[in-house]
């Protein structure tokens, strides 16, 4: 049985992840962390009844991870929190599932160094949906055949999302750029802005949109649109739990959802 711990346990994603852990036959929740609601039962926020696991203060992360013998820590919090907590978990020998977006390249380098130094396993992905990762694969293939077309990415999310553009949109851009040998990114357009051979990336924020991503390949006489729409955050939580179940059987290293899904 895999011992799982969850950061941000009272939040929207953390509570869904806990709900999905309770449905797993291979994993059990042993620790839940947040900055508030300390001492309350984690099941209260996941709406799954009393689990007997109290919310621990994230300040006690190292102590609780060691005490509970956690095998894996799932983190869908914020970049400023992940950059602190991921190295602590790695130092405890705990594997990591990181779904936090908005992490800078410098922050990611620090996290990856801690993972390598401590010989743990980690999956780092901006999106744990199976469909989105298939979407990336389709976009990669399309880019190879539509390299001369203008390429635009449009993403839309709820009005509470802090980072823009989304990690998923940036990953889509990276996938295209890798397929085409490198592309410049342009974020939105304003004023006199002639189009070059760049990838345009645009963010929309409004209401309760879970997550929409569209990649457009636009030619002079036709347009190809590849679209993914998320209807529920459950897809991210299910994917994270799937990744956590998978990672514990792997060699130490840093993995993506491509590895988890065999894409």
Curated annotation (Swiss-Prot):
Chain sites annotated for binding (S)-2,3,4,5-tetrahydrodipicolinate: 158, 167-168
Subcellular location field: Cytoplasm
Record field: transmembrane: none
Chief location of this protein within or outside the cell: cytoplasm
Pfam families according to UniProt: DapB_C, DapB_N
EC number: 1.17.1.8
Domain of life: Archaea
GO CC terms in record: cytoplasm
Keyword annotations from UniProtKB, A to Z: Amino-acid biosynthesis, Cytoplasm, Diaminopimelate biosynthesis, Lysine biosynthesis, NAD, NADP, Oxidoreductase
Catalytic reaction list: (S)-2,3,4,5-tetrahydrodipicolinate + NAD(+) + H2O = (2S,4S)-4-hydroxy-2,3,4,5-tetrahydrodipicolinate + NADH + H(+); (S)-2,3,4,5-tetrahydrodipicolinate + NADP(+) + H2O = (2S,4S)-4-hydroxy-2,3,4,5-tetrahydrodipicolinate + NADPH + H(+)
One GO molecular-function entry: NAD binding
Pathway noted in the entry: Amino-acid biosynthesis; L-lysine biosynthesis via DAP pathway; (S)-tetrahydrodipicolinate from L-aspartate: step 4/4
InterPro entries xref list: DapB_C (IPR022663), DapB_N (IPR000846), DapB_N_CS (IPR022664), DHDPR_bac (IPR023940), NAD(P)-bd_dom_sf (IPR036291)
PROSITE patterns: DAPB (PS01298)
Active-site positions on this chain: 157, 161
Residues binding NAD(+), per UniProt: 8-13, 34, 99-101, 125-128
NCBIfam families: dapB
Function: Catalyzes the conversion of 4-hydroxy-tetrahydrodipicolinate (HTPA) to tetrahydrodipicolinate.
Family stated for the protein in its record: Belongs to the DapB family.
The protein's name in its UniProt record: 4-hydroxy-tetrahydrodipicolinate reductase
The species this protein was found in: Methanosarcina mazei (strain ATCC BAA-159 / DSM 3647 / Goe1 / Go1 / JCM 11833 / OCM 88) (Methanosarcina frisia)
Gene: dapB
């Amino acid at each position: 049985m895999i011992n799982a711990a969850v950061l941000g346990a009272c939040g929207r994603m953390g509570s869904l992840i806990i709900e999905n852990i309770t449905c797993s036959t291979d994993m059990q929740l042993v620790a839940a962390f947040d900055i508030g609601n300390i001492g309350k039962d984690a099941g209260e926020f996941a709406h799954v009844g009393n689990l007997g696991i109290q919310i621990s203060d994230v300040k006690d992360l190292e102590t609780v991870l060691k005490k509970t013998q956690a095998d894996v820590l799932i983190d869908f919090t914020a970049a400023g929190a992940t950059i602190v907590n991921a190295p602590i978990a790695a130092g405890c020998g705990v594997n990591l599932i990181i779904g936090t977006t908005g992490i800078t390249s410098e922050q990611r380098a620090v996290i990856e160094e801690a993972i390598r130094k401590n010989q743990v396993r980690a999956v780092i992905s901006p999106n744990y949906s199976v469909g989105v990762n298939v979407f990336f694969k389709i976009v990669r293939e399309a880019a190879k055949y539509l390299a001369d077309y203008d390429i635009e990415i449009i993403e839309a999310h709820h009005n509470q999302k802090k980072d823009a553009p989304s990690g998923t949109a940036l990953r889509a851009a990276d996938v295209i750029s890798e397929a085409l040998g490198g592309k410049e990114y342009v974020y939105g357009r304003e004023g006199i802005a002639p189009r070059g051979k760049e990838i345009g990336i645009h963010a929309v924020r409004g209401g309760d949109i879970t997550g929409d991503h569209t990649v457009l390949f636009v030619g002079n006489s036709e347009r190809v649109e590849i679209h993914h729409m998320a209807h529920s955050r459950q897809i991210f939580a299910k994917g994270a739990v799937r990744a956590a179940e998978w990672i514990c059987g792997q060699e130490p290293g840093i993995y993506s959802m491509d590895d988890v899904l065999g894409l």
